[in-house]
Amino acid sequence: MLYFLPTPIGNLADITLRALEVLERCEVFLCEDTRVSKRLLHLLAQNPIISHSFPNIATKKREFIAFHSHNDQEFLNQIKPSFFDKEIAVMSDAGMPSLSDPGMSLAAYALKHNIQYDVLPGANALTTAFCASGFLEGRFFYAGFLPHKSKERRLKIAKILNALAYLEEKTPVVFYESPHRLLETLKDLNDLAKGMHLFAAKELTKLHQQYYLGEVSQIIERLQQSTIQGEWVLVLLNEKKIEPCMGLSALLELDLPPKIKAKIEAVMTQKNAKELYFQRLLEEKNQ
């Protein structure tokens, strides 16, 4: 049996009873970082309530195997489905497996090979931050971590905002970001989503948890005066309607004269308008 086991994102008290039962029962742990998972079990065992109800949670002999984005496919190619005849749990360092953490490929593998598995509900930064944001929209778009390089990051942000422009309703976008890239990401957001409101959550559920709300430029101004630490969740509210762009294929389907279509296509593709015009005439003749 395979279990997808959520772990606390900061506060150890957020562990669930079901998770504790699985932690004590399992023989093998597939871990994002084996050191972090071992430390979690050790810390949980220090709690007198947990140690009384689950005395073997840290003492039982079990196997810890690294399972992350750099080795997941290699691992799955090497094992046989019978490997999961044991009691096995997949764990990320913090939060829910598969949400910007290892696990999604394992679920696909289990489905393909008819392996029984269960996903335990539990703590994750995504829903915690969205609920804390105060944004009234009952839906959101989860973008996960943005690319490290500015050019790629800006391109991804632009693509997301452009895609959301086609929706009639406002749809907040949730990003994860690390402390050393936070200001760079906020500056990119400010350039591409100027005037939009942002909710930023620092170190959710931890001792130094903190919330920020305001326009992106205002949050940049506040954070530039402080030392940025901890993991962050950003919830961007796309309040301003972004005019969607019509794609080339959609434009060519409009009821327009061939010459007009050719001129539009030439501008969009940098091709010769005259050649495109004769191509459109030929297409209409063959219809």
Curated annotation (Swiss-Prot):
Give me the reactions it catalyses. Answer: cytidine(1402) in 16S rRNA + S-adenosyl-L-methionine = 2'-O-methylcytidine(1402) in 16S rRNA + S-adenosyl-L-homocysteine + H(+)
Q: Name one GO cellular component term.
A: cytoplasm
EC code(s) of this entry: 2.1.1.198
Under Gene3D superfamilies, the record lists: Cobalt-precorrin-4 Transmethylase, Domain 1, Methyltransferase, Cobalt-precorrin-4 Transmethylase, Domain 2
Entry-linked CDD domains: RsmI
Which InterPro entries does this chain map to?
4pyrrol_Mease, 4pyrrol_Methylase_sf, 4pyrrole_Mease_sub1, 4pyrrole_Mease_sub2, rRNA_ssu_MeTfrase_I, SAM_MeTrfase_RsmI_CS
SUPFAM superfamilies xref list = Tetrapyrrole methylase (SSF53790)
The entry's localization annotation reads: Cytoplasm
EC class:
transferase
Main role?
Catalyzes the 2'-O-methylation of the ribose of cytidine 1402 (C1402) in 16S rRNA.
Q: Which NCBIfam families match?
A: 16S rRNA (cytidine(1402)-2'-O)-methyltransferase
What the record says about family reads:
Belongs to the methyltransferase superfamily. RsmI family.
Q: What is the protein name given in its UniProt record? A: Ribosomal RNA small subunit methyltransferase I
The gene for this chain is rsmI
